[in-house]
Each structure stands twice: as C-alpha cells, then as structure tokens.
Regions:
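A cross-kingdom marker for long, charged
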Residues: 140-263
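Acidic/His-rich structured neighborhood in mature extracellular/periplasmic domains
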Residues: 9-173
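N-terminal, post-signal-peptide region of Sec/Tat-exported proteins
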Residues: 1-7
C-alpha cells in the first residue's frame, strides 16, 4: 500500500516484530561476521573452480538472506540465495517452535552453519543441471546424475568431508562405507536398477531418516542412491585417468559407469 498510509505502517511494524526473534537468532549464529566471511570465501572459491572448468556457464550472484523458513536455497542460473535461518545450528531454541511435521529432527540436525557453502554449491549444481535428467528416469539414471553432482561438488569444496557433502554424520558415513557391498546388492537386481517407477526410484535419493528400500535397515542414512552413484563415478574416473571433467560430468549413459564399479 501507500507508504503514507497508516495501515501500511502498521503492517510493516507487525512484520518487523514477528521477524525480530529470527533476525536476532541469525545474527548470533549463521549471520555472524566471521561465519559469513568463512562460508562466502568457500562458496566463491567453489564457483571460481566451476568457472575455470566451465567458462561458458554464468557465475551466480550470492545472496545471504532470512527466508522466514520458506527455503534453504533458492538457486537460479544467475542468482544463488541462501536462507540463513536454515543454518542457525540444531540447538538454536527458535527451532523448537517449528512444526515437527515440516521440520523433523533429522532435518533440524542438518541446519549447521558450517554446511552453508557446501549445501549451496551442491544445490546450485543440482538445480542448474536438473534438465539433464531424462524423462522416465530409472534408478541407474539418477544414480549417475547424483554421482556426477556429488563428485563435482567434492572437487569444488575440497575442505568438506564426504559425510558433510551428503548431509550425514561421520557415523552415517562409516556405516555406508562398511555396508557398501550390501547396499549394492540391494540395488543391483535389474528390476531395481532399471526401475522407472518414480515413487520407487526416489526412495533411493530422497531426504529422510534412512533409506526405505528392500532389506536396508533403519540404521542406514538416507540417499544411499546418491552415495552409490558417487562411488560409481569415482570408480569410472579412476579407471579412466585421462578423462576430462566434461567427459564424465556431461555423460548420460550409466552403463560405462556401472561396468567399472566393483564394490
């Protein structure tokens, strides 16, 4: 409304009153000067590495902002907005007021300030390359896509641990490493590897407390399809040491990657 209208002023005052606790929480956590400097430097370094490998791609402007818990990341080809309220730390008291149906404990546990840059880098790559996912994508297709994204993110964010890049704890990463062959045995059957039922395929890649597929136990971490895809891409690039980045990152046929992966 009109800036001179008293009703408009009242609405703005109400908005500021409602936002104040969130802004104060951000200022003491993810929005602290040293935290933002550290995460900005890491993210910009990652984007510079991307530009060196893919000079034709536009580099997005990075915007740190409160989102009102509407989004953690809002990536476009030219802008990468990061919701600071999603990275205030899992022990921030304000998070206790969020509805558990939308913010379950596993999601709260991942709201770490030190994950802002790596989450933003990975999220930007996922969104800007999602057009490469083929229609009727099979489990194998999404394993390749996620593996490519994870491997490229790891090159751009060399100081991030593998567990961090998957939004896992170190214990969850250790579990996956110890059970890699058993996980592979669950996805290897043709009816799972080349399944194109979206609901069944996404069980391997969606966020959750664990991976809800077959005989995989509840102590497993989520997104085990992304984990196996990453392992698959790592195995392929190791076997093809002369392969340039665009040679494996832009590939869309999972078969050569499946052939070189032997857990």
């Amino acid at each position: 409304g009109d800036a001179q209208d008293s009703a408009t002023v009242d609405v703005l005052r109400q908005f500021l009153t409602e936002m104040r606790p969130m802004l104060e929480a951000i200022d003491s956590t993810s929005g602290q000067g040293d935290v933002l400097r550290r995460e900005t430097e890491a993210l910009l370094d990652g984007l510079k590495r991307h530009q060196a490998l893919f000079p034709e791609d536009p580099v997005p402007d990075v915007v740190w902002m409160p989102s009102g818990f509407n989004f953690a990341l809002y990536p476009t080809p030219t802008c990468l907005a990061v919701g600071l309220d999603w990275f205030m730390g899992p022990t921030q008291p304000l998070l206790e007021e969020l509805p558990p149906s939308q913010f379950p404990q596993y999601r709260l546990n991942r709201m770490k300030p030190e994950w802002m840059a790596s989450d933003a880098m990975k999220g930007w790559l996922l969104v800007t390359h999602q057009h490469r996912i083929p229609p009727g994508a099979r489990t194998a297709d999404l394993m390749l896509f996620w593996g490519q994204i994870m491997h490229l993110t790891s090159l751009y964010m060399p100081n991030a641990t593998p567990a961090q890049l998957l939004n896992w704890t170190s214990e969850e990463w250790a579990w996956a490493e110890a059970n890699e062959r058993a996980i592979w045995a669950q996805v290897q059957p043709q009816e799972r590897m080349f399944n194109d039922n979206p609901r069944e395929v996404m069980r391997w890649f969606q966020e959750g407390p664990f991976t809800r597929v077959g005989d995989i136990p509840q102590e497993s971490p989520d997104k085990l399809g992304a984990y196996l895809g990453w392992k698959m891409v790592q195995a392929h690039t190791a076997a093809r040491g002369d392969l340039p980045v665009d040679g494996w990152f832009m590939a869309q046929d999972p078969q050569p990657f499946l052939r070189t992966y032997r857990p």
